[in-house]
Structure formats: C-alpha cells, structure tokens
Amino acid sequence: MITLTDYFMGRDKQYPDELTEEIRSNAAETVAKANLLLSSYRMLTKDEEIRKVNSGWRPALINAATPNAAPRSKHMLGLAIDISDPEGDLDEWCMDNPDILQTIGLWLEHPSCSKGWTHVQIVPPKSGKRVFYP
C-alpha cells in the first residue's frame, strides 16, 4: 500500500512553503485511487510484487530537474503518481482494463512513454482520452 509519506518522498519537509492544502487534498485522492488500482490489479492477477512510488509530488525545483518532465506537470499539483513497473506488467494490465481505470477515476499515460513506471493521474488530459500521450 502506498502512503502519503511515500508519495511526498520527504519533499513535504524540504519544500513546506510550496505544499498547499489543495495539493495535500489532491495527493490524498491520488494515493487513494492509486491504492484502489493496485488492489484491483493484485486481486485479478495474483501479482504480489511490491510497487513503490517512482515520482509523487514535485515542487517546482524538483520538476525542473526531472528529465522529460512537462513544465506544468500534474505531479506539481499532487494530481499524478508514477508507480514502479519495471517489466511493464501493470501498464499492460491497465491497457487491458480501461473500464477499471474509468471506475476508479484514473487516466493512464501511454506505456510507450513511461518505460519502467506506470503514470496515472486523477484528472483527464487535454485530449480527454483514458489512455493518452503527453
């Protein structure tokens, strides 16, 4: 299970002035929905691999230093999470189960753009597509 501590990655202590109540609220929703996704995945696949947060909340300096990060990344607002997925199994399962993403209220960055992790967010992208290209 992913916790808010996992999601903040110590950045809540390093950058307290950037962490607003809105970001905290968004982060709580993001973590809750990510845990629902992982619970569904584990229940249906019996995969027990421990999934860690590759990237959670990103303050501006962290986002600017993150390779290939969008200048207005949803991570900066607590609206997105990258979950470790070294073999791509979680991404593949998400691609095969868009109905579960929809039920939970998550949007998936296309796996071809996120090798080694699964990026999900709690708000739709500009395209509105459940699976999107950044």
PLM feature spans:
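N-terminal, Lys/Arg- and Ser/Thr-rich interaction peptides
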Residues: 1-23
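Short, polar loop/linker segments at the starts of domains and inter-domain junctions
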Residues: 17-22, 69, 131-134
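N-terminal compositionally biased, intrinsically disordered segments and leader/signal-like regions
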Residues: 4-6, 46, 104
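A broad, low-specificity signal marking well-ordered, structured residues that form hydrophobic/aromatic
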Residues: 2, 44, 51, 81, ...
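Extended, low-complexity, intrinsically disordered C-terminal regulatory tails
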Residues: 31-68
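Catalytic cores and adjacent binding grooves of peptidoglycan-active enzymes
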Residues: 71-72, 76-134
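N-terminal post-signal-peptidase region of extra-cytosolic proteins
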Residues: 21-34
